[in-house]
């Protein structure tokens, strides 16, 4: 028998969108800001998500 295929990993943007849908805009924005704080840099993806998480 074959094993089930592995689930695809979510992109960062998809993860933020899911948080936005589940917990709301404020949570998604805080999640995005903390990601940049934890990696000690502001990446372009984080800025895109921060600007778009409330859309």
Curated annotation (Swiss-Prot):
<dbReference type="GO" id="GO:0046872">
    <property type="term" value="F:metal ion binding"/>
</dbReference>
<dbReference type="GO" id="GO:0009505">
    <property type="term" value="C:plant-type cell wall"/>
</dbReference>
<dbReference type="InterPro" id="IPR028144">
    <property type="entry name" value="CYSTM_dom"/>
</dbReference>
<dbReference type="GO" id="GO:0140487">
    <property type="term" value="F:metal ion sequestering activity"/>
</dbReference>
<dbReference type="InterPro" id="IPR051671">
    <property type="entry name" value="CYSTM1_HM_Tolerance"/>
</dbReference>
<dbReference type="GO" id="GO:1990748">
    <property type="term" value="P:cellular detoxification"/>
</dbReference>
<dbReference type="GO" id="GO:0010273">
    <property type="term" value="P:detoxification of copper ion"/>
</dbReference>
<keyword id="KW-1133">Transmembrane helix</keyword>
<keyword id="KW-0964">Secreted</keyword>
<dbReference type="Pfam" id="PF12734">
    <property type="entry name" value="CYSTM"/>
</dbReference>
<comment type="function">
    <text>Confers resistance to heavy metal ions (e.g. cadmium (CdCl(2)) and copper (CuCl(2))) by chelating them at the plasma membrane of root cells, thus stopping their entry and reducing their accumulation. Binds to aluminium (Al).</text>
</comment>
<comment type="similarity">
    <text>Belongs to the CYSTM1 family.</text>
</comment>
<keyword id="KW-0472">Membrane</keyword>
<keyword id="KW-0346">Stress response</keyword>
<protein>
    <recommendedName>
        <fullName>Protein CADMIUM TOLERANCE 1</fullName>
    </recommendedName>
</protein>
<dbReference type="GO" id="GO:0071585">
    <property type="term" value="P:detoxification of cadmium ion"/>
</dbReference>
<feature type="transmembrane region" description="Helical">
    <location>
        <begin position="24"/>
        <end position="40"/>
    </location>
</feature>
<dbReference type="GO" id="GO:0005576">
    <property type="term" value="C:extracellular region"/>
</dbReference>
<keyword id="KW-1003">Cell membrane</keyword>
<keyword id="KW-0479">Metal-binding</keyword>
<dbReference type="GO" id="GO:0005886">
    <property type="term" value="C:plasma membrane"/>
</dbReference>
<keyword id="KW-0134">Cell wall</keyword>
<keyword id="KW-0812">Transmembrane</keyword>
